[in-house]
UniProtKB/Swiss-Prot annotation:
This is Ribosomal RNA small subunit methyltransferase H. GO terms for cellular component: cytoplasm. It is found in: Cytoplasm. NCBIfam families: 16S rRNA (cytosine(1402)-N(4))-methyltransferase RsmH. GO terms for molecular function: rRNA (cytosine-N4-)-methyltransferase activity. S-adenosyl-L-methionine binds at residues 33-35, 53, 80, 101, 108. GO terms for biological process: rRNA base methylation. It catalyses: cytidine(1402) in 16S rRNA + S-adenosyl-L-methionine = N(4)-methylcytidine(1402) in 16S rRNA + S-adenosyl-L-homocysteine + H(+). InterPro entries: RsmH, SAM-dep_MeTrfase_MraW_recog, SAM-dependent_MTases_sf. It comes from the Bacteria. Keywords: Cytoplasm, Methyltransferase, rRNA processing, S-adenosyl-L-methionine, Transferase.
Length: 318
């Protein structure tokens, strides 16, 4: 199937990240190239965009979609947790703009073979990068009940995590769990009928939790945000689009930590307190989609965009 993914908050991304001619931008989750396709013309003449994605199919789609930009764009299959090393290997000292569009793409959800969706029966996979060894089937069939409980609770914020984990373990004793349909049926059986009738699909939180664990999503996000100090040029902008509270909390805390102001007396020539103001917030509160965008693209409903800017100069002059 063709790689399709409608970029969310596109107008807001362009306004807040404000790409300019000659700048260097990184789209750390290039997907099908939707955001990049809108950013690139604003970088010309003389600008460049580096796009990253873990998914080989996304990389192929982005290369095809952005081919017209020639040498002004490079698409690489990579995990954004390695961004600093990727830039260093290319001799790039810093970037003017950086965008993260977190989570799973529409293509990955809609392609049954990828095993992300609880809406269709498919092989239980959930790997964002097909070169990964760990699959959802491996997790649900082999991880201890205690570990499954912890993952479903922490990453899915699922109140029925202990029951779901217990039902998974009991079911796999009878036969291996190999499809999304099997797993959905087990989850539905584990959650009491009254709870199933309210709110979202009963499997939503468990599928989210497994996907996050399998792909190391939150660890990768933390690792990438820890590199902002060394990656962003003075005045450089970073934007992160998140889709659930766990991601947004990590982004909010990282931006807050990097916004720590120096507490030294004004007369000191060199900072001795160890606190440095690396980022200043561009958005005081997360930007959310308009009602019109949600109507046009319902999957944008839970999106939140936070943007920050690298300070022009540290107090110690670095």
């Amino acid at each position: 199937m063709p790689f399709t993914h409608q970029p969310v908050l596109l107008t807001e991304v362009l306004h807040l990240l404000d790409p300019q001619p000659g700048e260097f931008f990184v789209d750390a989750t290039v997907g099908g190239g939707g955001h990049s396709r809108a950013i690139l013309p604003r970088l010309l003449p003389g600008g460049h965009l580096l796009g990253l994605d873990r998914d080989a199919e996304a990389v192929a789609a982005a290369r095809e979609r952005l081919a017209a930009f020639g040498a002004n764009v490079e698409i690489v299959q990579a995990n954004f947790r390695d961004l600093a090393a990727i830039l260093e290997a290319r001799g790039i000292p810093g970037v003017d703009g950086l965008l993260f569009d977190l989570g799973v793409s529409s293509y990955q959800l809609d392609n049954p073979e990828r095993g992300f969706s609880y809406q269709v029966d498919a092989p239980l996979d959930m790997r964002m990068g097909q070169d990964q060894e760990l699959t959802a089937a491996e997790v649900v069939n082999n991880w201890p009940e205690e570990k499954l409980t912890r993952v479903i609770w922490q990453y899915g914020e699922e109140r029925w995590a202990p029951r779901i984990a217990a039902f998974i373990v009991a079911s796999r004793r009878q036969r291996p769990i190999t499809t999304t349909g099997q797993l959905v049926a087990i989850i539905k059986e584990a959650i009491p009928a009254g709870a199933r009738r309210s709110g979202h699909h009963p499997a939503k939180r468990t599928f989210q939790a497994l996907r996050i664990a399998i792909n190391g999503e939150l660890d990768a996000l933390r690792a990438a945000l820890e590199q902002l100090d060394s990656i962003l040029k003075p005045g450089g902008r970073v934007g992160v689009i998140s889709f659930h509270s766990l991601e947004d909390r990590i982004v909010k805390e990282a931006f807050r930590s990097l916004s720590g102001r120096c507490t030294c007396p004004p007369g000191l020539p060199v900072c001795t307190c160890g606190r440095r103001e690396v980022l200043v917030p561009v958005t005081r509160k997360p930007v959310i989609p308009t009602a019109a965008e949600i109507v046009a693209n319902p999957r944008a409903r839970s999106a939140k965009l936070r943007v920050a800017r690298r300070v022009l100069k540290d107090k110690d002059g670095e």
